[in-house]
Amino acid sequence: MDFDLMVLRKRLANRGFQAFVCSDIKEAIDLITKSLLNKNDSVVGIGNSMSIRELELTNFLSSKTVYERNLTGSNEDERKALHADIYFTSANAISYDGQIINIDGTGNRVAATCFGPKHVVFVIGKNKIAESLEKAIERVQNTAVLMNLQSIT
């Protein structure tokens, strides 16, 4: 199904999110590094996410303190990421009406998005959009969980 990303953007805005639509990875990196990442954001948290890894975001953060468990394997870094100035993560799925669905093995990403840094940036690819909440949950159960298992084994 082909989704109108501007409609989804408006629906996210109606839920209190500021959403941006990028045409490719380069545009997403430019948006993050030139607009979203404030010069005062000295501490950056990164949730374990294949979408974030695809951006190779850590390559653009050399002047920042970065807490990402993938870099160190440290649970302590997961805790420190909760207090970052800005936190980057992805979602397992998003419904076309703007509901973000995340199921998390250890809870670090969900905790950070709900109770952590003041600024949270979700990087969500078109492949994660589902036509309804039910289809989004189905995507999580049948696709995202399996992909996450493959990425950690």
Give residue spans per PLM region.
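N-terminal active-site beta-alpha-beta segment that forms phosphate/nucleotide-binding
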Residues: 2-88
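Conserved phosphate- and dinucleotide-binding cores of soluble alpha/beta proteins
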Residues: 82-153
